[in-house]
Regions:
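A short secondary-structure junction motif
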Residues: 223-227, 231, 286, 290
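Short pre-active-site segment immediately N-terminal to the catalytic Zn-binding motif
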Residues: 197-214
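Post-HEXXH active-site segment of zinc metalloproteases
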Residues: 226-248
Length: 339
């Protein structure tokens, strides 16, 4: 939970916290758009130290951090919180991440039709060991906060968490591991790739922007349409195979929309190009990366990939013959859309 019950280390922890708080105040002068958050974070650290390192409560600083309000390409942020990391540490440690926003012009235009105001695609600049993991997201839900009764609320009003208004997705890490795994998997399976798919695997920035487009549409779909299970089960990702269906639902929605965009002559050429690349990204991430790099136990992302592979095989657009994988690229989009 982030608390430090061992009193014998409180002195050295207090010295460390004083250093963090001082650094945050110093850095606040250099990052004007994060100034309120950084100063609030320094206070939260000092309050935690003064409390004797009980369970940390960073409610105020988390409430002050709003990267979603300044989605301009290259905008830097420093994020410091006691937090756990998805696919990483389940304990709450103080983690620091320096990141920058990825927001190409075509995404800014696309978002007018695919509104997702909480979506914050980012790339790593530097990070503490909690992100030396498979984690490719930074979510406010992972930060140590204690629910509070809203100011001015009626007596008896239950305590609430702050409103979570953003979610950070590290498109650079997604793109890099996608390129590495898919390049090797296509060589092992002797899959002949079209020229634009080869370019996607060779170009990191191209892959990053492709993932931003995919994530923009995928992420918003989690809040739209019919869920395949009770929404209260989302946090638990249970039962895991049904969560695989939910991930497939969002991926197939993104795929379908990108097929529409790629075929619409009224859409600009850059957006149409990335709409075609997203189709490769969805296919390869699902049939290669998730099953190959994830854990073998209760891996809902892998289940979704296996379902897609099986459907494409049954529909005769994917063939595994004499240890070689072949795909009917012309027929593929409509078959995936039919699923």
């Amino acid at each position: 939970d982030g608390s430090i019950p061992e009193k014998s280390v409180h002195k050295i922890c207090a010295i460390a916290v004083a250093g963090i708080a001082g650094s945050l105040r110093e850095i606040a002068d250099s990052i004007e758009h994060d100034r309120e958050y950084l100063l609030s974070c320094a206070l939260d650290f000092e309050r935690w130290s003064d409390s004797g390192f009980t369970v940390p409560d960073f409610f105020d600083s988390l409430s002050a951090f709003h990267p979603e309000k300044n989605r301009v390409d290259g905008t830097p942020h420093l994020v410091v919180f006691p937090m756990y990391t998805q696919n990483g540490s389940t304990d709450r440690f103080v983690e620091a991440v320096v990141l920058e926003i990825i927001w190409p012009e075509f995404i800014a235009e696309l978002e007018k039709n695919y509104s997702n105001p909480a979506f914050v695609p980012v790339r790593f600049i530097d990070f503490t060991p909690g992100y030396l993991t498979n984690s490719a997201v930074i979510f406010p839900e992972s930060v140590a906060v204690t629910p509070r009764v809203p100011e001015g609320a009626e007596p008896g009003t239950p305590a609430e968490l702050p409103v979570f208004s953003w979610g950070g997705i590290f498109a650079d890490r997604e793109a890099a591991r996608f390129r590495k795994v898919v390049q090797t998997a296509s060589e092992v399976t002797r899959l002949e790739l079209p020229a634009d798919a080869q370019e996607l695997l060779q170009n990191q920035q191209l892959a990053e922007h492709t993932f931003v487009m995919w994530d923009l549409i995928h992420d918003r779909t989690h809040m739209r349409g019919d869920l395949p299970f009770d929404p209260f089960m989302i946090k638990q990702r249970m039962p895991f195979f049904l969560y695989g269906l939910e991930e497939m639902r969002c991926d197939l929605t993104a795929f379908r929309e990108c097929v529409k965009l790629s075929r619409d002559k009224s859409v600009d050429a850059e957006t149409r190009k990335f709409a075609s690349l997203v189709q490769y990204a969805v296919l390869f991430d699902r049939i290669f990366r998730f099953p190959l790099t994830g854990t073998r136990k209760r891996n809902y992302d892998s289940v979704a990939g296996q379902l897609l592979f099986a459907y494409l095989h049954k529909s005769h657009v994917l063939h595994w013959t004499d240890t070689q994988l072949t795909i009917d690229w012309a027929e593929l989009p409509d078959v995936v859309v039919s699923l």
